Amino acid sequence: MSFSSDEVNFLVYRYLQESGFLHSAYVFGIESHISQSNINGALVPPAALLTILQKGLLYTEVEWSVGEDGEVARPIEGLSLIDAVMPEVKPLKPIVKTEPGKPGAVDSSAPAGGNQNNNAKPEIKIEPGTGVAGSAGGNKIAGSTTGTSTPTDQSASEVDSSGNAANNAGGTYAGNNGAGGNQASTGGSNSTSTPAGGDLAAPGASQKKSQNSNEAGSSSSGNAGNANATSTDDAASSTSTNGNSSTSSSVEQPTSGLTPAGGTVSTSNPDAAASGGASTATGSKAPSGAVTIRVGAQGNNVQSGSSNAQSSAPSGTISSSTSGGAGTPAALVPMDIDENIEIPESKARVLRGHESEVFICAWNPSRDLLASGSGDSTARIWDMSDANTNSNQLVLRHCIQKGGAEVPSNKDVTSLDWNCDGSLLATGSYDGYARIWKTDGRLASTLGQHKGPIFALKWNKCGNYILSAGVDKTTIIWDASTGQCTQQFAFHSAPALDVDWQTNQAFASCSTDQRIHVCRLGVNEPIKTFKGHTNEVNAIKWCPQGQLLASCSDDMTLKIWSMNRDRCCHDLQAHSKEIYTIKWSPTGPGTNNPNTNLILASASFDSTVRLWDVERGSCIHTLTKHTEPVYSVAFSPDGKHLASGSFDKCVHIWSTQTGQLVHSYKGTGGIFEVCWNSKGTKVGASASDGSVFVLDLRKF
């Protein structure tokens, strides 16, 4: 028997990721040089460390139960992990298992000479099948006699071969534009998607999408790399609380000072905004008393709460509010989906080909071509036209030069975007390169200037510039025709998570440094800087008119900014966990739907989606059918419907006018991204199990 420190470090690294400690995993991966090991993370099963620890405990129990003569002296059961590593702590009396509802027994495994407590310790109950909001993982967990939860019944649809529980970034880190979309985040909400056994991404970066918060995110397969993308200090400053990317099991304690899920929306004046923003900072974790751990049947999210936890009583499907989203916690508990609105399998086309999580997908604006980006270091273009029934795919392999030859980069493709006429596709990868592809799959140009993973990438409306954001704390405007860097902006003090164009030459960027900068091509300083968030900012979006900027953060707030004011116009507080992404409706003045009111949608790790009337600063509808973190929302072209995708594997289609759920489909993996085609007839979705699927809504 032999093992190396590299092997131990890798198992610890993977354990931290799977447990939702994305920030710790990121820093540990850098300091232990995980990226330099020769371990193939794709071959290591999930919960490997817990499995080997459990086997070690069982061996120790057997060893202690057998006397020196080889005869069974006394059975040892329920040995704790700490006692097992203390040879001098051998039980003096037989251990009596404490059963629920029975008087506590003396724990004879307590250290010798220590004070014995005749009161049995509170039992941690594992309740399989209980859905827990906020879980991003896909594993089912069963309790063991050692009190350790280990994944069981791991299907490919729930946990991929790389051990990804599917951030970021959230978390937050899975690229906002894609999985990274907020992507690498702890999962940080947009969480930065942190690859398990894959690339090391700064928590809170775009791969947050794989990313999420304390509920951490999906990992991508491949050798952990990019460890030198940021220094350890940078990593610390860039970590997010939602792990964006980030969707694995999480253990939470009641948080003090947090706004309940049915909280209120405060419309702040310039002065009140600052104080309001500060007041939304995440409160300190408070210890809980008797603890119940519930394990969701569809995820390995573990939520620990005290007796004053939110009620789980049944409630209606929608909680409408005209007073800023105020409501009761019970109103946010999801109900079963009505079978009448379920989309049948015959109306869904499942596209197989990717070999790892698919973080991002986007429709071509002119044709029924669906692009997808994955942790298998490829992007793919799927022909979804009615004439093509075979779902032909073009594979866009992301390669790098090594030793004079082109080899696969083995890095996640976390962001992608079509240009305005659909003739070119831009992709961003964890290998630090952006690439431009033609619709026939040919590589047009490679854009190399970032020093680390790219978390977000966008074309401007004219199609002459591409904007990118990376872990190197910079944003870059690229000349699309030449592939050259036109201007690099280095104003953030931590990884940049998302970008969005305001005009063809001006844009906004957000970062884990809690700042939002508005910059313009040719100007060497930000033309505006917005401050007010108290945690990393996962996503930003300009309204269709380019007048208002919306931002969402791990501080659980949604803020609306105007270039005419230094402080936020609205500080919307209603979500009870990190907000991963936001989208404006394609309605209002200057759009194709000028007679429909402008609304804003927000998706959160609290498993809800909220629709906001931005003019009034109030929550119109709270959509509560999801049971896991929601990573993506998308409006139909006419603004009448909203699609949402969650790690509960469901894509829901909602009416934006009534807030009612009108269609629903359950896939085989946690959903990272949803998108509508230009005609509003099809919805595409990408999932953690490597699948991509298209829902045809024309029949309904």
Curated annotation (Swiss-Prot):
One of its GO terms (cellular component) is transcription repressor complex. PROSITE patterns: LISH (PS50896), WD_REPEATS_1 (PS00678), WD_REPEATS_2 (PS50082), WD_REPEATS_REGION (PS50294). The keyword Repeat applies. Widely expressed both in embryos and larvae. Residues 142-160, 251-270 have a biased composition (Polar residues). WD repeats lie at residues 353-392, 408-447, 449-488, 491-531, 532-571, 574-622, 625-664, 666-700. Residues 4-36 form the LisH domain. One of its GO terms (molecular function) is DNA-binding transcription factor binding. It is found in: Nucleus. Keywords: Cell cycle, Nucleus, Repeat, Sensory transduction, Ubl conjugation pathway, Vision, WD repeat. Residues 93-287, 299-331 are annotated as: Disordered. Its main location: nucleus. Residues 41-84 form the F-box-like domain. It comes from the Eukaryota. Belongs to the WD repeat EBI family. F-box-like component of E3 ubiquitin ligase complexes; involved in R7 photoreceptor cell differentiation, cone cell development and neuronal cell cycle control. E3 ubiquitin ligase complexes mediate ubiquitination and subsequent proteasomal degradation of target proteins. Required for specification of R7 photoreceptor cell fate in the eye by participating in the ubiquitination and subsequent proteasomal degradation of Tramtrack (ttk), a general inhibitor of photoreceptor differentiation. The F-box-like domain is related to the F-box domain, and apparently displays the same function as component of ubiquitin E3 ligase complexes. 'Ebi' means 'shrimp' in Japanese. Component of some E3 complex at least composed of sina, ebi and phyl, required for the degradation of ttk. Probably forms a E3 complex with sno, required for the degradation of some component of the Su(H) repressor complex. Interacts with sno and Su(H) and Smr. This is F-box-like/WD repeat-containing protein ebi.
